[in-house]
């Protein structure tokens, strides 16, 4: 599905890797709305100049993107129908919650959300 989002050619492979991870997580633990939101966030990050996703580990970006989507949608609120702990999310991507939160904060600042 990656090519339809008009990703810069130099970032297509990175985008595909990151969204492959976010897609898998959303399929296993969340839903299609989260999957689509994560994809849109990844597209926006690809279009930043310079794009921050050009460097760093893909699983770090994937974790940060899902964490950010979760923060703005109250995923970590146990009173919501769809919820989970930040620890669970970060563990899936093999990160501690502080790392996930830090990356999420950076992403939210870059995308001016939350």
Task: Report the location of each language-model feature.
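Short, structured motif recognition centered on aromatic/hydrophobic residues
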Residues: 61-68
């Amino acid at each position: 599905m990656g090519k339809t989002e008009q990703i810069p050619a130099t970032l297509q492979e990175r985008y595909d890797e990151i969204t492959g991870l976010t897609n898998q997580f959303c399929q296993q633990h969340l839903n299609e709305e989260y999957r689509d939101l994560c994809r849109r966030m990844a597209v926006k990050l690809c279009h930043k100049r310079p794009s921050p996703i050009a460097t760093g580990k893909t699983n770090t970006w994937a974790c940060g993107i899902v964490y950010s989507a979760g923060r703005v949608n109250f995923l970590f609120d146990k009173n919501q129908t769809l919820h989970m702990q930040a620890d669970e999310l970060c563990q899936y991507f093999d990160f501690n919650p502080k790392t996930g939160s830090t990356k999420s904060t950076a992403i939210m600042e870059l995308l001016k959300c939350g």
